[in-house]
């Protein structure tokens, strides 16, 4: 078992290379997809409905694929207009909060114009702000809708309904009241409120002034036209999402929902969860989401659907409450909510507690190893609020983890030091029993027992580092708090790769390397590679030539592989390697074991000089 420790280390290292290589070469950045052409007008009287009766959008009169109102049949079809022109088609009430700005159209009363004040498309504050929701008629409609469905109730509010507003502004502490009378005995009143972050509260009241009872079903939905460009690369979920009572978390990608059976029509596929209590449904991106939240103590039907209309796919998540029967002169009130904004961890958790929303924290994809990723984020967030820099927080958390695992690591390094001390005896045993593997292994075991050496103890530092590495990678990738979080110098976004590149000599040459160049190697990946190289040179080279070559190339492989990883992860790896080198150096000196670093470096340069001389 003389090579057991080395073999296991190689196996673990190669396994890590395979895992990282899989991400880099297989599930890395996908090729750019063109966004689907969108449609503009939807869900009006007579529009298609899903199996639960909720309106399903369909391009009709007023859409880009139909003649505009007042034109003759056969007139040229109109394409999507600019977002500004689409917003101008309806009178609107302005939304203005510390976190959001936008508007609600009085035609349809959809929440279809929301932008985020505090988030920009790039690191620069001069770049455009993030646009979350957009109206029909624009290139990428994405909106939330609330209403009622039912039979024999006369006209009900739809996408063409013109509501009356009691004001011209929706702001925190300043709710908006909308009213509409269907002319057949039903009066609808909607009060929309918004907090200082990302939560809308929609209170729908309907009064029956007719002489007949009426049965209605309240609903809310989030609809998105066209498949967006996703960024998850299998690391996190993007698409339709929700918590449906006892069925728990449901995640459907844009492709998956289209593979479900027909739902309410041949052009619509989807799945429904009936008679569930507690939960929410929505559509999530990497950092942003829109979610409809029904009353948590009442049963509802939740649904995920995809409707195909020509080249357009319309994705929709919806909830429909149980029937409400209104006797003459009776009224009913339903309160629903809409989350539309950034997936800030603390804000999501606060909403879950404040409104009792079932498992709302699952809006953030912590992954299967949430028991590692959540504590990792908590630690980083805690130190960020103390220090004001997530990069420094990463360094400090790494140091604390090193101290926490110090006893295990010390035992490992002490065992490794003892292995170095008995290296001559191990070499002698291999020579003595080179033709008898059984006796060689027995002699090695006796030596280990005599010297109290654990041959696989050296693997523990690597085993400990692997889960920490992936937990930090997940946190850097999924949490918006890490987005555009600066470190020092040229690192202005810990969640993005090091922006420097060896292609232009790290900025010395006056050009920006094109994105299609496969080599992405910045300063920090090179620093990480150097620290890994030094760590390898702390130990004598393995006697097996194959293993020696693997160890020699590992720093190079990891340097190029981590070049496209988030800078925060590369900084962590470089810092962890540095701490490991210091720790191993101190332990080896304490145990009287020679540190091989300088001899290995001198030997490497001597071999290089000899090779150059021989060629000369």
UniProtKB/Swiss-Prot annotation:
GO molecular function, one term: membrane insertase activity
Gene3D superfamilies found in the cross-reference section: 2.70.98.90
Superkingdom classification of source: Bacteria
Compartmental location: Cell inner membrane
TM region positions: 8-28, 386-406, 460-480, 516-536, 551-571
Compositionally skewed regions (Low complexity) per UniProt: 36-51, 64-80
Record region (Disordered): 35-83
Keyword vocabulary terms for this entry: Cell inner membrane, Cell membrane, Chaperone, Membrane, Protein transport, Transmembrane, Transmembrane helix, Transport
Any one Gene Ontology BP term: protein insertion into membrane
Membrane topology: Multi-pass membrane protein
GO cellular component, one term: plasma membrane
HAMAP family with a match to the protein in the record: YidC_type1
Function, in words: Required for the insertion and/or proper folding and/or complex formation of integral membrane proteins into the membrane. Involved in integration of membrane proteins that insert both dependently and independently of the Sec translocase complex, as well as at least some lipoproteins. Aids folding of multispanning membrane proteins.
Record family assignment: Belongs to the OXA1/ALB3/YidC family. Type 1 subfamily.
Subunit structure: Interacts with the Sec translocase complex via SecD. Specifically interacts with transmembrane segments of nascent integral membrane proteins during membrane integration.
Name listed for the protein in its UniProt record: Membrane protein insertase YidC
Source organism (scientific name): Methylorubrum extorquens (strain CM4 / NCIMB 13688)
GN (gene name): yidC
């Amino acid at each position: 078992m003389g090579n057991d420790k080395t073999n296991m280390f190689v196996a673990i290292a190669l396994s890590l290379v395979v895992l990282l290589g899989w991400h880099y070469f297989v599930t890395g950045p996908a090729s750019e997809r063109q966004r689907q052409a969108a449609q503009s007008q939807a869900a009006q009287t007579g529009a298609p409905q899903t199996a639960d009766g909720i309106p399903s959008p369909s391009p009709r009169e007023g859409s880009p694929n139909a003649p505009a109102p007042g034109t003759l049949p056969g007139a040229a079809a109109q394409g999507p207009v600019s977002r500004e022109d689409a917003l101008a088609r309806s009178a609107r009430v302005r939304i203005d909060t510390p976190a959001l700005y936008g508007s609600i159209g009085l035609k349809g009363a959809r929440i279809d114009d929301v932008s985020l004040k505090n988030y920009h498309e790039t690191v620069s504050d001069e770049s455009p702000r993030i646009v979350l929701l957009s109206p029909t008629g624009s290139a990428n409609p994405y909106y939330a809708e609330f209403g009622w469905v039912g039979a024999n109730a006369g006209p009900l509010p739809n996408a063409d309904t013109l509501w009356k507003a009691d004001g011209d502004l929706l702001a925190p502490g300043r709710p908006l009241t909308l009213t509409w009378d269907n002319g057949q005995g039903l009066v609808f009143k909607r009060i929309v409120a918004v907090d200082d972050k990302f939560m809308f509260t929609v209170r729908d009241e309907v009064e029956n002034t007719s002489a007949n009872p009426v049965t209605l079903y309240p609903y809310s939905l989030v609809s998105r036209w066209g498949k967006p460009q996703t960024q998850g690369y299998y690391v996190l979920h993007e698409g339709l999402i929700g918590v449906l009572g006892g069925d728990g978390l449901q995640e459907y990608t844009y492709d998956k929902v289209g593979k479900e059976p027909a739902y309410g029509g041949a052009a619509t596929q989807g799945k429904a969860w009936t008679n569930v209590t507690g939960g929410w449904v929505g559509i999530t991106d990497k950092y942003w989401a829109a979610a409809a939240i029904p009353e948590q103590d009442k049963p509802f039907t939740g649904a995920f659907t995809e409707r195909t209309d020509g080249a357009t796919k319309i994705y929709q998540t919806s909830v429909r409450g149980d029937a409400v029967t209104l006797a003459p002169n009776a009224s009913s009130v339903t309160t629903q909510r809409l989350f539309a904004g950034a997936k800030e961890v603390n804000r999501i958790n606060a909403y879950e507690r404040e409104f009792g929303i079932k498992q709302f924290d699952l809006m953030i994809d912590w992954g299967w190893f949430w028991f590692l990723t959540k504590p990792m984020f908590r630690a980083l967030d805690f130190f960020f609020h103390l220090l004001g820099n997530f990069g420094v927080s990463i360094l400090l958390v790494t140091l604390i983890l090193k101290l926490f695992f110090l006893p295990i690591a010390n035992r490992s390094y002490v065992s490794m030091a003892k292995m170095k001390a008995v290296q001559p005896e191990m070499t002698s045993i291999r020579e003595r029993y080179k033709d008898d593997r059984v006796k060689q292994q027995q002699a090695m075991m006796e030596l280990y027992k005599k010297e109290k050496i654990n041959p696989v103890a050296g693997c523990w530092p690597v085993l400990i580092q692997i889960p920490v590495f992936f937990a930090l990678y997940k946190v850097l990738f999924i949490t918006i708090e890490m987005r555009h979080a600066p470190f020092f110098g040229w690192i202005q976004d810990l969640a993005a790769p090091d922006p420097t590149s060896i292609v232009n000599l790290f900025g010395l040459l006056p050009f920006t390397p094109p994105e299609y160049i496969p080599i992405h190697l910045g300063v920090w990946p090179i620093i990480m590679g150097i620290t890994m190289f030094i760590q390898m040179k702390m130990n004598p080279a393995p006697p097996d030539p194959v293993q020696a070559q693997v160890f020699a190339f590992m720093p190079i492989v990891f340097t190029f592989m981590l070049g496209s990883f988030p800078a925060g992860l590369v900084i962590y790896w470089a810092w962890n390697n540095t701490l490991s080198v210091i720790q191993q150096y101190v332990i080896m000196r304490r145990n009287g074991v020679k540190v091989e670093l300088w001899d290995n470096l001198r030997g490497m340069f001597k071999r290089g000089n000899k090779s150059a001389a021989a060629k000369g």
